[in-house]
Amino acid sequence: MNDQSITVRGKDRYKSGVMEYKKMGYWEPSYQPKDTDVIALFRVTPQDGVDPVEACAAVAGESSTATWTVVWTDRLTAAEKYRAKCYRVEPVPGSPGSYFAYIAYDLDLFEPGSIANLTASIIGNVFGFKPLKALRLEDMRLPVAYVKTFQGPATGIVVERERLDKFGRPLLGATVKPKLGLSGRNYGRVVYEALKGGLDFTKDDENINSQPFMHWRERFLYCMEAVNKAQAATGEIKGTYLNVTAATMEDMYERAEFAKELGSTIIMIDLVIGYTAIQSMAKWARRNDMILHLHRAGHSTYTRQRAHGVSFRVIAKWMRLAGVDHIHAGTVVGKLEGDPNTTRGYYDICREDFNPMRLEHGVFFDQHWASLNKLMPVASGGIHAGQMHQLLDLLGEDVVLQFGGGTIGHPRGIAAGATANRVALEAMILARNEGRDYVHEGPEILAKAAQTCTPLREALEIWKDVTFNYESTDSPDFVPTVTPAA
């Protein structure tokens, strides 16, 4: 689209007044991105009557060096280098009026190792730009030179499995329910019953911090007492995600230190604390040999809508840089948003050393992760034992499966719910290891396991008809098609 540069050169470039962005050097269709460039892919929807190339050039300008008028101080900088360059504009398939804008940024525009600084440019003022109806950051290519300035996940999948001594299967967890209102003693009872019944982890929910019905210190004490008792009863290493999210960094450090003193192996934070706080807690976790779980609370306010916001695949990349060990990444079959192909893309970003471009998964760029640890994805929200074959097929084994209601809602009690999930998982892993087609035989495998496990039989009966089959609001723009044979 309009593959000729129209940049104004020489003294005319710096005449006072207003100049189109595409003439100021922010539209360079002949530009070849360098290996060290940060590349962003935006979905741009211009206002009616706005030239698409001008709109995309404006995104490049407003997310780097431009303002609304020519300023003479540009001549005091290496302006040609520091201007972001939109080098490619394409219509979005199936979305009339929207365009993909590929924009390259020189690496020197960004402070090393700072998500806050990166986002201040890439998703800063530009999202409020009036000539745009909508703007969405779809994907980013982060150069190795930039990736290496971040610590990455504090623990990583391999070391986490070694600490837990659990291999070859997904980890099992449950979020304590109800998420609000329990006393510390009753909260601890839920943790104990779930861990004793067969789960590896329990977790706080995103909004349980330190409220009048249960202060944080009380919760930590009862939870760790439950963990220690469950470990003694089962002979397995157990854990519970203690949410240290708080009003200030000082409060969060205090809570994390107390969790460490009590012997916890894992702490939890919420996405809403912000990028700087997340990176700060990740550095603390690495120094203190603690697994760091991130709940993506709040993400759907800007990731769910297809036309405007930030794709979760970008958030996943930022969080892998930032250094968390766990991140909620969708279930496909549960109650929360999650197109199968899009969700696979999220999981690939978390778990691969190198992400090749996979347009069918919404991944637009090759991404090298250098030596950064892998990030453990977490599946939670509306899943139950009857879906175990689907979960294993869709999400693989390096994942934490969180059955909250699917554990605590069991008619025979919490421990029975945990046992049902553990037996269902073990049966499916055994079938997979035997080479069986566990995806198609899944219901049969579960039914056979239920013959000798009353809790599983009851779980399959009570939740057999529960599905969440709604159309996804965020699916890939490119769908693979079969080429007919000649």
Swiss-Prot record:
Signal peptide: none
Subunit organization: Heterohexadecamer of 8 large chains and 8 small chains.
GO biological process, one term: reductive pentose-phosphate cycle
One Pfam family in the UniProt entry: RuBisCO_large
The UniProt record lists the keyword Lyase: yes
Top-level division of the source organism's lineage: Bacteria
Cystine pairs: none
Task performed by this protein: RuBisCO catalyzes two reactions: the carboxylation of D-ribulose 1,5-bisphosphate, the primary event in carbon dioxide fixation, as well as the oxidative fragmentation of the pentose substrate. Both reactions occur simultaneously and in competition at the same active site.
Cofactor note: Binds 1 Mg(2+) ion per subunit.
Site feature (Transition state stabilizer) residues: 335
Record-listed E.C. numbers: 4.1.1.39
Record PANTHER family: RIBULOSE BISPHOSPHATE CARBOXYLASE, RIBULOSE BISPHOSPHATE CARBOXYLASE LARGE CHAIN
Keywords: Calvin cycle, Carbon dioxide fixation, Lyase, Magnesium, Metal-binding, Monooxygenase, Oxidoreductase, Photosynthesis
Modified residues (N6-carboxylysine): 203
Gene name, Swiss-Prot/TrEMBL: cbbL3
Record's protein name: Ribulose bisphosphate carboxylase large chain 3
Misc: The basic functional RuBisCO is composed of a large chain homodimer in a 'head-to-tail' conformation. In form I RuBisCO this homodimer is arranged in a barrel-like tetramer with the small subunits forming a tetrameric 'cap' on each end of the 'barrel'.
Record PROSITE patterns: RUBISCO_LARGE
Family: Belongs to the RuBisCO large chain family. Type I subfamily.
Keyword Repeat set for record: no
InterPro entries linked to this entry: RuBisCO (IPR033966), RuBisCo_large_chain_AS (IPR020878), RuBisCO_lsu_C (IPR000685), RuBisCO_lsu_C_sf (IPR036376), RuBisCO_lsu_fd_N (IPR017443), RuBisCO_lsu_N_sf (IPR036422), RuBisCO_lsuI (IPR020888)
UniProt GO molecular function: magnesium ion binding; monooxygenase activity; ribulose-bisphosphate carboxylase activity
Residues bound to substrate: 125, 175, 179, 296, 328, 380
Active site feature: 177 (proton acceptor), 295 (proton acceptor)
